[in-house]
Regions:
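Conserved core of the sugar-phosphate nucleotidyltransferase
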Residues: 91-140
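Active-site-adjacent loop/tail segments of enzyme domains
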Residues: 42, 69-99, 126
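Short beta-strand-to-turn element immediately C-terminal to the catalytic PLP-Schiff-base lysine
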Residues: 72, 106-108, 160-162
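N-terminal polybasic phosphate/anion-binding patch
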Residues: 1-63, 75-77, 129-132, 179, ...
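GST superfamily/GST-like fold recognition
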Residues: 3-15, 121-186
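Mobile beta-alpha loop/short-helix "lid" or hinge segments that flank ligand
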Residues: 16, 20-29, 106-113, 143-157
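Residue-level signal for inorganic ion chemistry
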Residues: 17, 47, 68, 87, ...
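Ordered, amphipathic secondary-structure segments that act as subunit-interaction surfaces
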Residues: 63-69
């Protein structure tokens, strides 16, 4: 097998998978957000399309890895916030509640077009978030590139009540899930 390419501009994903010596090529895929109820197909299709968009850019046979993360509250998908107000609204909506963080990973062989996809779900419960705490977080960390308006690795004390599941999954990609999916190509 040739090289492996991460079709992502996420520094968090690149860091989690750094031991794999992946080439990084940000996916040119443009996400079309349609506010729908959550389904695994939704996030898995985004991961697949991100990887697929890199295939024409590659000449030698390679494994292309795409990923997408969504935050889900009930059936509502909380994507990346549009602006400050949207980020504030999302974080206040998550206050005192348990939500799911779902990351889908797709791996495509650029030559054969064989692909495998899986999803990992983790759960996060937030404490009661004051307006001041939320405003301070948004002003300091500018979470506008993060699903659900937060990065768990940068949340200050006072945010998290409980985490269930794979922390890497919440950050952006589970190395365990990636390794398991990669086995299908060996």
């Amino acid at each position: 097998m040739g090289k492996m390419i991460l079709a992502s501009s996420s520094p968090r994903r690149a860091d989690i998978l750094k031991d794999y010596k992946l080439e990084i090529i940000p996916s040119p895929y443009v996400e079309k957000h349609t506010k729908t109820a959550f389904s695994y197909d939704y996030v898995e299709n985004l991961a697949y399309n991100k990887a697929l968009a890199v295939v024409p850019l590659i000449e030698e046979e390679s494994l292309i890895i795409g990923a997408d993360t969504v935050v889900v509250l009930g059936e509502e998908i909380l994507e990346k916030p549009k602006d400050y107000e949207d980020a504030f609204s999302m974080l206040k909506k998550l206050s005192t509640r348990t939500h799911s963080v779902v990351t889908a990973i797709a791996i495509i062989n650029s030559k054969t077009k064989e692909f495998k996809i899986n999803s990992t779900t983790s759960h996060v419960t937030f404490k009661d978030l004051s307006d001041d705490l939320v405003n301070d977080y948004i002003n300091k960390f500018k979470p506008f590139d993060k699903a659900g308006s937060y990065g768990i690795q940068e949340l200050p004390d006072g945010f998290i009540e409980k985490v269930e599941g794979d922390l890497e999954n919440i950050i952006g990609i589970s190395s365990k899930s990636f390794e398991n999916l990669l086995k299908d190509f060996q």
